[in-house]
C-alpha cells in the first residue's frame, strides 16, 4: 500500500477537522461518555481552534493519504508549542491517528518515520509524547519504535481526567 504524506497549511483546516474528528471518535468513543467526547471535540477540533494551531510556526501537521483518500494525520510540536515543558530541542508528537480501516498497513509507521525525519532535520535530542494508559495499541506501537516511559500527566477529555503515560525516544545526540 502506497502512503503519501502532505504538509497542511491554514487552508487545510476543514480537511484536518474531518480526519481529526473521524479518527478520535473511532479511537475513543467506546471508552468514554458521549458528553465528554462531544465537549472535547467541540473544544479541540473546531475549525477556529485548528486554524490557530495550523498557523502556529512551532506546530506542524501532515496527512497520510492512500489512493487520494486522507486516512490519518500527524501533529508535531517544537519549542513553546509543546504541551509540557521539555528541552527546547525536543520534538513532541502530539497526535498520530489513523483510520481503523488502515491499521496494520504501514500508515502509522509512515507517519512516525516522517516524525523521525523531522526530528533528525531539526537535530532534536529526543522525541516525546503522551499516550492514554488504556490505549494498548498505541503503547505497543511506541514501545516497538523504541519509546520508553518517563512519567505521566493528566489529560482532560471533556470533564474526565485521564492518565497519559509520557514516553520518549532518545536520539543519542
Residues covered by each model-derived region:
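Acetyl-CoA-dependent GNAT
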Residues: 7-13, 17-30, 38-101, 112-114, ...
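Active-site acidic-Proline motif in GNAT/NAT acetyltransferases
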Residues: 99-101, 105, 133-134
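Conserved acetyl-CoA-binding loop-helix of GNAT-fold acetyltransferases
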Residues: 104-117, 140-144
Amino acid at each position: 500500500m502506497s502512503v503519501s504524506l502532505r504538509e497542511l497549511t491554514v487552508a487545510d483546516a476543514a480537511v484536518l477537522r474531518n480526519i481529526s474528528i473521524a479518527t478520535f471518535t473511532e479511537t475513543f468513543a467506546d471508552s468514554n461518555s458521549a458528553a465528554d467526547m462531544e465537549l472535547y471535540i467541540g473544544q479541540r477540533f473546531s475549525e477556529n481552534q485548528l486554524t490557530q494551531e495550523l498557523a502556529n510556526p512551532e506546530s506542524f501537521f501532515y496527512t497520510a493519504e492512500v489512493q487520494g483518500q486522507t486516512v490519518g494525520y500527524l501533529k508535531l510540536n517544537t519549542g513553546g508549542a509543546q504541551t509540557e515543558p521539555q528541552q527546547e530541542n525536543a520534538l513532541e508528537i502530539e497526535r498520530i491517528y489513523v483510520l481503523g480501516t488502515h491499521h496494520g498497513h504501514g500508515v502509522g509507521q509512515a507517519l512516525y518515520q516522517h516524525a523521525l525525519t523531522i526530528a533528525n532535520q531539526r537535530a532534536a535530542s529526543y522525541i516525546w509524547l503522551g499516550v492514554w494508559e488504556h490505549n494498548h495499541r498505541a503503547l505497543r506501537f511506541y514501545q516497538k519504535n523504541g519509546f520508553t516511559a518517563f512519567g505521566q500527566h493528566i489529560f482532560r477529555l471533556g470533564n474526565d481526567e485521564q492518565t497519559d503515560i509520557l514516553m520518549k525516544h532518545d536520539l543519542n545526540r
